Amino acid sequence: MSLREEYARQEAELDELYKEIILDHYRNPRHRGSLSSPSATHEGLNPLCGDEVTVELLVDGDRVADVAYKGSGCSISQSSASMMTEAINGKPLDDVKRLSESFTAMMRGEENVDPESLGDLEALSGVRKFPVRVKCATLAWHTLEEALEEVGI
């Protein structure tokens, strides 16, 4: 097997793994629902395709004590919201802000992003190949950033 063929095989395996991660979050969403007393609530809408998401944060001191989302839309938008809530729950607010910036940079195709800092969120990197879907993947993240502004971050 040539180096090129090996690279193509590995890329196909990675794409399949990423699809599995995205589908798992779509079928088994994490942190979907509402919080009883959120510190911040913000709604986001993608008018191009109708995706909707509401992000709720419970902030305790300098960390996200709990997070929830609800919404409707395509598998990309809803999986991204689930993956986001799983990634930020319990994390310091500064880390959440950095993660959001890194995720957004990855979705813009910037090369200065450390893939290891993103964990499973890297599974959404393939969405960049479909520019119209990037808004689906980033909807929850933009909504999170607005919720963070609501709590002064």
What are the residue ranges of the model-derived segments?
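Short, thiol/selenol-centered motifs that function as redox-active sites or metal-ligating centers
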Residues: 71-78
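Structured beta-strand/loop patches that form or line metal/cofactor-binding pockets in enzymes
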Residues: 28-71
